[in-house]
Each structure stands twice: as C-alpha cells, then as structure tokens.
Amino acid sequence: MPENNPKINIVIHRGVNQIGGCITEVATEHTRIIIDFGNNLPSNKEKELTQEEISQLTNGIDAIFYTHYHADHIGQFALVPNTVQQYIGEGALEVMKCKYRTLSKTGDFMQELCALNRMKTYKPDCLIQIGDINITPYYCSHSAFDAYMFKIQANRKTILHTGDFRQHGYLGKGLKGTLRKFIGQVDVLISEGTMLGRLEEKVLTENEIKRNTAEVLKKHKYVYALCSSTDMERLASFHAACMETGRKFVCDKYQKSILDIFAKHGKNKSLFGFEQAFTYPHKETEKVIGHLRHHGFLYVVRGSQEWLIKKRMETYNDEPAYLVYSMWQGYHNGEEAVRLPNVMRIRDIFGNRIFDGTKDGFHTSGHAELQTLHDVCMITQPKTGVVFIHKDATSSPQYLHLPANIQVINNNDNNVEFIIASDNPLGCNNMRFGFEIG
C-alpha cells in the first residue's frame, strides 16, 4: 500500500459481542479519538478494566466523545487520565453534575465531580475539529436526555457512529430527516444493535405509553410511577397524562432539579417544559395533603425510595394505590446478576396492583427496533459496510434482510480492528479487516 495513501483505523475495543461497556477508537496517522468509554453491565461476567488498563488504552488518545450519560457508555469517565480531554452534550453534563452533587451528600464522589468539572461540551450540529478528525454531533431520541450520534470525517472518509437511538420516541420523528439532510452516504456505519437479540420484545411509542397512563389515571386516584429519573421522554409521557386527566404530577426535589435541566435545554417547551410538576415539600402540611387528596396524583419514584412510598401510602390511604412499573422487566424477573432487590421490594408493596412494563404497555425500549435499523442502513448506504455494536454475542443481523451491496462486517472476537482506505475489501482475518484504494 503506498505510504501517501491516507487511511482511517477503527478499533472496536469492546461492544461487538456485548450490550454496554462500549469503547470504539477512530484514528488517523496523526489523531486518535474514542467514542464512549462505558462500564460493563452487571450481567457481564468479564472483569472491569483496571486503572492501569484504562491508562494504557487511553495513552496517546487526543479526545473522548460520549454519546450520552448512561453508565454503560460513560461509566469509566472518572478514571480517564486528566491529560485526555473528554466531551459530552451540555444538557447531559448538567444532569451528570446534578446526580453526583446529590450522591456526594452521602458518599465520596470527589473524583467524579472533578472529572466532570474538567469535561468540555459540544453543541448539536456544530463541528469540532480534533487534529485531522472532524466530529459533528446530531441529536437523537433515546431513553437518556441529550443523546447524540456522531458524524466523523477524516481523510475524505465518513463514519456514522449512531450511539444508542430509536425512532419510537417523541424526538425520533426527526431521525430520517437528519440522516438524509446531514449525513447522507457514509463509508462505514457503526450502529447499535441491541434489539437484534430481542426479536419478541414489544415496542411501543412514547405516545402510546402516555395514552395508557392517562387511562390508568382516570380510574385510579393514587398512582406511583417507578422509572428512570433521567428519561426525559418517559417523564414527559407521564406529565402529559397528568395534564390530560387533571391529576398532579408529583416528584421530589432531586427529580425536580433534573426536570428543570430538561426544561432549560429541551426544544419542545410544550412537551418538555414540565410546568405542572409539583415538588413534594420536605414538611407536609394539611393544605398540601388536602390538595393532593382532592386531585389525586402520579408520583414519580426511584428504586431507592421504598421508604417514601410506604410513608406516602400511609398519608394517602383513602383509596388503594397502584404502581406503574416503567422499567426493564429483567430488574425483577431476570437472572440473579441483573435483578434489583430494591425494585423487587417496591413491587411487593403493591401486590397485584401493578401496571406492568412492556407486558401491559407502560414501558418501551430506548433502542432502535429492526425496521429502524434497516432504514438507517438503507439511507446511509455504507460503502465499506456496517458494524453492529452494543449487541449480544448471539444476535444476528440476518433478520434485517439487507441487500447484498451492504456488507455486514462481523467478527467473533470481542476486539475488532479494521482499516478504511478504500471502498474495495482486500480480505480479512479474525482480527483485522483491510481496505485499499482501488
């Protein structure tokens, strides 16, 4: 290969055969960046990276870009050496700081807070140049607020790294337009493939969850909703259902601070403004109790708030309380490694008075289902091929029914490395895929 033939190296350090723990490196001769540096999920039996391994992996890295703030994508951020610049969305950084400031009241999270204070931010649609690599973030719908996909350009080549995304959220309607207008055809598509291994999972739109929640609120006066405190679109569904039915949308001070960040950065103020959110006061008053007994409520709770639910149920006891379980089913009925005892105890409080997740229409995935994955491949038409990450080892893209001109770059090893230097494959072995200008 001629020495003056520029190339791009892509290394999937982790994520080809596992959901979460994603680490993807993109490098030219002069510049190296990493997309996401996440923790392994609890179900993963592999040992987590040590501080020494993280230092070795990031040695010579010019920047790390995070697609969003879920731990399986950003969890190692506090262990990254100070010499490596890290980037995340503006709203996402505020959420992270809010979370760790709250945690620091009961534990030592100084290392995390210091790392967050050093972290830089990017803006949607605004190019950032790191050496000879250009990175442009584009907003996408996910179960995390302020999530992005990245268009990466270098050496006249284009890579799209989707991060985690979906089309069935409120913000998902802009996906195809963004791909057609701002991305176009790419050389390599690096796409999440979570749902490739969940063919039977029911996928609802957030709007359907809103309608289902509204029906529950019409029938029941006191409803507790167990969900992620940072899932903006799910919380917007619950808030909208309360506004439609006249119920009060109730939360604690921490949740309200997260909602305020959503409202500050959210583009759709009517949906993401959370104007009617009611912060339950530290000291109850007869006025507050009377107000909520009269109107009824949907009370947003977290897995750590078993005590709060019991306390509120003692106060608001004139009618039975119900639980909207809006989380992954595996947290209560999965393998032991992924079950959350606090979630199971909260469910036990309500007995059979539970509107149960995906089964009953109150939860949906934060990840693209098969048709959306197919559509992204067809719109971007990757010249070299598509690599699916963030997927189980047994997942297969065969159900996408992609045309023959779209090559799925596959590898059975956890570490995949390949080079983009042309549109024509020279061949590959278990560890390396090579391409040369024809």
List the predicted regions and their residue ranges:
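Short, charged/polar "capping" segments at the starts of alpha-helices
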Residues: 43, 94-97, 198, 233, ...
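C-terminal regulatory/interaction regions
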Residues: 18, 244, 276-438
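Short connector loops at secondary-structure junctions
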Residues: 38, 194-200, 254-264, 352-369
